[in-house]
Structures are given as C-alpha cells and as structure tokens.
C-alpha cells in the first residue's frame, strides 16, 4: 500500500511491501470520489507497473471530478476495470427489503442525493 509520506529509513520509499511488477490488482475498502484510487494508480504507473483492476468492497457511487461517477471516470481516464462487492444502490435496496435495516433507508438515500452521480 502507499504511504502518505515518502520514508528515507526502514523499508523506505512511498509504498510498503513487494515492488509491484507487471499487471496489478488494486484492492481497497471504499470508493468515494476516486481521489485515493487516482493516487494509487499514478504511484503504480510511476513504478512501471500496470494497474488493471480496481476492486473495492463498497462503491458509494459518488461523483468523481465531473458529473460522471468516480467508477466511470477511473475506467475512462485509466482504462482500468473497476468492480465492487456491493454498491450504494444495492445497499439501499437491501435496507428497503429488510425490516431490521429500514431505519437506514432515509439516511442512505440522503447520502445518494447529496453525493451520488
């Protein structure tokens, strides 16, 4: 994973772990506006590796830098496949259909209304 600041001691550098080589799968917990994803992709490209797939647990389906979703912008700008385990629409639908999660529906829909693409 990438560091917030480049270190000149210990492992050093701006990433932790093995040097990425060839095609790379990026795994992250959440995709919001795509800022962290763009940063990771650029770091990997600067190390001469090729990010091919960006896999996230939750795609919040937020707008990226423009009117498109962050997912669509990443796909268009970097030619990378973006996949998620679940997205905000599915989470809302699940909450609507399950009594124990009904209390979250209004808040989730409000989030989508404010930030969604």
Model-inferred region functions:
Residues 42-117:
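PRPP-dependent phosphoribosyltransferase catalytic core
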Residues 1-24, 35-39:
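Short, glycine/charge-rich flexible loops or terminal/linker lids adjacent to PRPP-binding catalytic cores
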Residues 27-29:
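Active-site flanking residues adjacent to catalytic metal/cofactor-binding acidic residues
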Residues 32:
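Short active-site segment of divalent metal-dependent hydrolases/proteases
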């Amino acid at each position: 994973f990438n560091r917030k600041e480049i270190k000149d001691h210990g492992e050093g550098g701006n990433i932790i772990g093995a040097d990425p080589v060839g095609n790379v799968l990026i795994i992250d917990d959440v995709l919001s506006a795509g800022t962290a994803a763009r940063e990771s992709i650029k770091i990997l490209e600067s190390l001469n590796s090729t990010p091919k797939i960006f896999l996230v647990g939750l795609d919040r389906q937020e707008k990226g830098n423009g009117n498109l979703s962050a997912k669509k912008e990443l796909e268009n700008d970097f030619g990378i496949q973006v996949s998620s385990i679940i997205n905000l629409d599915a989470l809302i639908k699940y909450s609507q259909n399950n009594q124990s999660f009904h209390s979250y529906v209004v808040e989730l829909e409000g989030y989508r209304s404010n930030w969604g693409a």
